[in-house]
């Protein structure tokens, strides 16, 4: 997020001084690290939680269209940076990877069929295929069928325009571009405070080695510290952060690097979450390409840790509690008992039980091929609510001061996939007096800026074709 915002600002105001502070010795070691996330270019091509079923049996596609629109904005920005030489070879961070939805059981097959009918004619979902034929599905992803009962009803959708994104590599590329063009990067720097001083913000930090204190004054501060953004915004004292809390959820995946297994799965395949389970529980079997090497990941399996970062402290959750967010946090917990039950179930699950979840996707999976990895921490947003006292939301939220001089990002998925539209929204919120003069430059970077591609099928086709060509991915 920080690297994206910095890169956009460098295009708009090349004369502005940009400083980046990183708690670890280099960027992208936390949530952006490719093994701390699934690397899905989230565009709702296969993620079934974006297309819920209405009470009348019809399929709601508004959320799917919104997420896809957002990812198209990110694609346009990345394509612009590649075309202008600001990003290197695109295959170093993004690769064409078919996106599939796969379900079993008569009710789920019926749902997926109706979802396909609702999406297939939409301009952002062109090329979506559907099949209930085991041999067709085997051709799409050979690992899904062997060992499966022939009597089991199954269905899948597939679209070639999906992507696998190495957000760690992308973050490093963007940061390198910034430092090559005048930005100053300080690693091993633990920011300890952000305080207002008249019309400036004083950012205080200590070296992780030696604990030497430093400070710098800035006219604008963006807090893109992942799970630690909440605490730093609380320290800033802005009233807009009052009532916000965070609930950390850790994640685990199973991974295999066995080339014989990996070669038989060239897609990201998303299933359907169990009834009553939270969106984060959607199981998926993913092709990952990291540093040019393919692997497979399956998960996520949820866990609990009070840390707000993978390298954080076990005191993080308790340190985030304030008088103004205590009621929202308690209320959100009381109204999300299904999440609590889900987490307890995941914590109690044995290794064999977890592996059985993989075998629902890949019946012939061999435990000898797979090993467990721990993914990043996701701090879900808790916010005050007039009716319920507090609610837990699965998404991201920009929190900014009234005068727009400080802002931060809270939350998790879809996260990095929508970094560009989120940061463009932040610019509109924090720099309302400049946004009009920036529009020509923003439109050069993101041709659809200020419009919706879904309103203009011809323009949508042109934009997606152009970005696919620039990024070397499928249309």
Language-model regions, residue ranges each:
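Short beta-strand to alpha-helix junction loop
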Residues: 62-75, 103-110, 157-177, 186-188, ...
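C-terminal catalytic lobe of FAD-dependent flavoproteins
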Residues: 152-161, 169, 304-437
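Helix-loop-beta segment of a Rossmann-like dinucleotide-binding subdomain
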Residues: 89-102, 139-181, 202, 338-342, ...
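Helical element adjacent to the flavin cofactor pocket in flavoenzyme catalytic cores
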Residues: 154-220, 231, 417-431
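Flavin (primarily FAD) binding-site architecture
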Residues: 223-238
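Dinucleotide-binding Rossmann-like beta1-alpha1 core, especially the glycine-rich loop
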Residues: 39-139, 294-295, 307, 313-316
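Central beta-strand plus flanking loop segment that forms part of the substrate or channel wall
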Residues: 43-45, 240-267
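Glycine-rich FAD pyrophosphate-binding loop
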Residues: 10-34
């Amino acid at each position: 997020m920080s690297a994206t915002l910095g890169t956009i600002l460098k295009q708009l105001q090349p004369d502005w001084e940009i400083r980046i502070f990183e708690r670890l010795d280099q960027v992208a070691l936390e949530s952006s690290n490719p093994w701390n996330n699934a690397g899905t270019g989230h565009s709702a091509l296969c993620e079934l939680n974006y297309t819920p079923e209405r009470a009348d049996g019809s399929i709601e596609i508004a959320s799917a269209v919104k997420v896809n629109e957002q990812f198209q904005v990110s694609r346009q920005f990345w394509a612009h940076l590649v075309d202008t030489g600001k990003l290197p070879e695109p295959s170093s961070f993004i690769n064409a990877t078919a996106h599939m939805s796969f379900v079993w059981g008569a009710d789920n097959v019926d749902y997926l069929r109706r979802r396909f009918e609702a999406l297939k004619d939409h301009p952002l979902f062109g090329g979506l295929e559907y099949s209930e034929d085991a041999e067709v599905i085997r051709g799409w992803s050979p690992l899904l069928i062997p060992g499966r009962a022939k009597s089991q009803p199954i269905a899948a959708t597939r679209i070639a325009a999906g992507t696998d994104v190495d957000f760690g590599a992308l973050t490093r590329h963007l940061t390198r571009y910034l430092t090559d063009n005048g930005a100053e990067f300080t690693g091993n720097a633990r920011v300890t405070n952000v305080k207002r001083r008249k019309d400036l913000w004083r950012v205080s930090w200590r070296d992780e080695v030696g604990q030497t204190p430093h400070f710098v004054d800035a006219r604008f501060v963006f807090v893109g510290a992942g799970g630690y953004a909440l605490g730093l915004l609380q320290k800033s004292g802005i009233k807009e952060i009052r009532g916000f809390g965070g609930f950390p959820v850790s994640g685990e995946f199973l991974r295999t690097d066995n080339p014989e297994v990996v070669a038989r799965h060239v897609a990201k395949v998303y299933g359907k979450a169990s009834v009553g389970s939270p969106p984060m529980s959607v199981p998926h079997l993913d092709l990952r390409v990291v540093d040019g090497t393919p692997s497979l990941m399956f998960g996520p399996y949820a866990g609990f840790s009070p840390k707000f970062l993978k390298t954080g402290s076990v005191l993080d959750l308790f340190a985030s509690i304030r008088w103004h967010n205590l009621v929202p946090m308690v209320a959100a917990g009381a109204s999300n008992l299904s999440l609590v039950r889900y987490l307890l179930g995941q914590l109690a699950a044995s290794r064999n039980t977890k592996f059985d979840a993989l075998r629902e996707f890949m019946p012939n999976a061999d435990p000898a091929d797979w090993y467990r990895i721990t993914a990043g921490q996701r701090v879900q947003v808790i916010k005050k609510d007039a009716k319920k006292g507090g609610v837990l939301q699965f998404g991201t939220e920009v929190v900014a001061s009234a005068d727009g001089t400080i802002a931060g990002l809270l939350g998790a998925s879809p996260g990095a996939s929508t970094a560009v539209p989120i940061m463009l929204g932040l610019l509109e919120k924090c720099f309302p007096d400049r946004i009009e003069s920036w529009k020509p430059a923003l439109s050069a970077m993101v041709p659809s800026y200020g419009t919706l591609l879904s309103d203009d099928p011809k323009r949508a086709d042109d934009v997606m074709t152009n970005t696919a060509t620039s990024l070397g991915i499928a249309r």
